[in-house]
């Protein structure tokens, strides 16, 4: 049977109760003037999320169809047809 006091020393693990400065830092977060750090961290996360959304939008696939611009022989102007609709029209006619 091992001694419990020597087991902690043998493994090198210590309890967090032995480090009072950690709990003091967490409890005195507002007193240390760290409120600005929380706000800055929130803004950094928002900027990262905004950049991720912009990069995903730029990497989006282009549309399947491309617009077709047709100039009619009677010269009544330029007509823009969507390629996909034009393809369906040509299949049905």
From Swiss-Prot:
The primary location reported for this protein is host cell
**Does Glycoprotein show up as a keyword for this record?**
yes
Q: InterPro entries, per this entry?
A: Adenovirus_Type-2_E3A
- How does the entry describe its membrane topology? Single-pass membrane protein
Task: Report what the Swiss-Prot or TrEMBL entry states about this protein's PTMs.
Answer: N-glycosylated and probably also O-glycosylated.
* NADP listed as a keyword: no
Residue ranges annotated as transmembrane are: 34-55
> In the UniProt record, which residues carry a glycan?
3
> What keywords tag this UniProt record?
Early protein, Glycoprotein, Host membrane, Host nucleus, Membrane, Transmembrane, Transmembrane helix
Provide a GO CC annotation, any one.
membrane
Q: Kindly list the places in or outside the cell where this protein is found, as annotated in its UniProt entry.
A: Host nucleus membrane
Q: Which domain of life is it from?
A: Viruses
The family assignment reads: Belongs to the adenoviridae E3A-1 family.
The name this protein carries in UniProt is Early E3A 10.5 kDa glycoprotein
């Amino acid at each position: 049977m091992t001694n419990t006091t020597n087991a902690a020393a043998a493994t090198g693990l210590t309890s967090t109760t032995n480090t009072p400065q950690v709990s003091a830092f967490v409890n005195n977060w507002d007193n240390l003037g760290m409120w600005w750090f929380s706000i800055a961290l929130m803004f950094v996360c928002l900027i990262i999320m905004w950049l991720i959304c912009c990069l995903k939008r730029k990497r989006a696939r282009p549309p399947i169809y491309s617009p077709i611009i047709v100039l009619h022989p009677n010269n009544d102007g330029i007509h823009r047809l969507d390629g996909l609709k034009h393809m369906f029209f040509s299949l049905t006619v």
